[in-house]
């Protein structure tokens, strides 16, 4: 299993890393949330571009990314435009989604971009190539806010991301039962043991899936999400509580 390094943060080794989202609408909101996060044990920041009111202007987005880079000099920044169909705030055309992600990657103000697996094969390839040409990592993702697919389907999607050049494949699914949480954990374990040659991120959402956000070191997920102020998905814990639990588990493993 290869690890992935952004700044001085190594993903896929030791305690799962903590990602804290920024979901500000205005430039002031974004910077205010950024300053709050500076005082937390966040390992990486996710800037949710789909929340940003100027997201349909690439120049404004790149300028905002530059300001975030100035705040987070040593902390990796992941830029994410989450589509409406996968739980995001805004829908844009596929063409603009590609343009936006490529512009942010070319700016080199971020360390990684999130690319949704089902954007389209050609479009995914364009963003992945552009990101890698500019030294930017790709977290490729898929989110199902309605159900938990079968173990085989979860593994299939993660393998597809790996084949398409993801530095870190990611899947988040919604449990309808505790058994669904076990399905996600079992898929994670099998993916890591039999298929993955790089770190992966998996989670079962909402309160039912909370154990999946805490047990990454046991089953093989390299990253978990915690909230400093505003949670970006159901089931996110506060970042300080999350850090305490992850460190406590680590000591016992």
Give the role of each language-model region.
Residues 2-4, 12-133, 146-147:
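Active-site beta->alpha loop and helix N-cap motifs at the rims of alpha/beta catalytic domains
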Residues 9-14, 70, 105, 162-163, ...:
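Solvent-exposed alpha-helices and their adjacent loops that cap or buttress functional pockets
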Residues 117-253:
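Catalytic alpha/beta core domains of metabolic enzymes, predominantly
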């Amino acid at each position: 299993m290869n690890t992935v390094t952004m700044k001085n943060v190594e993903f896929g080794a030791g305690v799962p890393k903590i990602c804290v989202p920024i979901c500000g609408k205005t430039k002031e909101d974004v910077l205010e949330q950024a300053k709050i996060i500076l005082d937390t044990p966040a390992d990486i920041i996710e800037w949710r571009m789909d929340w940003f009111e100027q997201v349909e202007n690439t120049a404004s987005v790149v300028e905002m990314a530059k300001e975030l880079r100035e705040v987070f000099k040593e902390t990796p920044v992941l830029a994410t435009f989450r589509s409406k169909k996968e739980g995001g705030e805004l829908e844009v055309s596929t063409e603009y989604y590609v343009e936006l992600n490529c512009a942010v990657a070319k700016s080199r103000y971020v360390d990684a971009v999130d690319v949704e697996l089902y954007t389209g094969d050609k479009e995914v390839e364009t963003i992945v190539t552009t990101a890698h040409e500019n030294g930017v990592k790709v977290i490729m993702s898929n989110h199902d806010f309605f159900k938990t697919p079968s173990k085989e389907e979860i593994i299939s999607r993660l393998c597809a991301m790996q084949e398409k050049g993801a530095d870190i494949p990611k899947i988040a699914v919604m449990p309808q039962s505790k058994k669904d949480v076990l399905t996600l954990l079992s898929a994670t374990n099998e993916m890591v043991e039999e298929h993955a040659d790089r770190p992966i991120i998996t989670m079962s959402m909402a309160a039912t899936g909370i154990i999946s956000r805490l047990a990454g070191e046991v089953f093989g997920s390299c990253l978990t999400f915690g909230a400093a102020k505003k949670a970006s998905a159901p089931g996110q814990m506060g970042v300080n509580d999350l850090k305490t639990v992850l460190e406590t588990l680590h000591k016992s493993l």
